[in-house]
Amino acid sequence: MEKNPIKYIEFTNSAAKKIKSIIKEKKNKNVKLRIYIIGGGCSGFQYQFIFDEKINEDDILVKKLNICLVIDPISLQYLHGGTIDYLENLEGSKFIVSNPNAKNTCGCGLSFSI
């Protein structure tokens, strides 16, 4: 398990604060936000977020403000150099992925191609 690979992927203070808030609501300090990639969407791949207690031996942990983001090595290949942010506006609230590896993204921003 590799810890703090900041050079691989980052998440903003806004994302860290929202993750911390959700974990507090869940009343389970052992959960961590996991981001992973699945096939699907209009562009071929989709970002998925879940709160997970399990950390696999080969998972990568990114820490910020005492919060851990968990990424499996295969998903990291698609997210390398990216940033996870959290945005709240009139349209709603959501985690946003800025992915420098995505050649195309769909209008909703949830699917991409490489």
Swiss-Prot record:
One of its GO terms (biological process) is iron-sulfur cluster assembly. The keyword Transcription does not apply. Keywords: Iron, Iron-sulfur, Metal-binding. GO terms for molecular function: 2 iron, 2 sulfur cluster binding; 4 iron, 4 sulfur cluster binding; iron ion binding. InterPro entries: FeS_biogenesis, FeS_cluster_insertion, FeS_cluster_insertion_CS, FeS_cluster_insertion_RrpA, HesB-like_dom_sf. Binds 1 iron-sulfur cluster per subunit. Iron-sulfur cluster binds at C42, C106, C108. Its cofactor is iron-sulfur cluster. It holds the Pfam family Fe-S_biosyn. SUPFAM superfamilies: HesB-like domain (SSF89360). Belongs to the HesB/IscA family. HAMAP family: Fe_S_insert_ErpA. Required for insertion of 4Fe-4S clusters for at least IspG. Homodimer. This is Iron-sulfur cluster insertion protein ErpA. The gene is erpA.
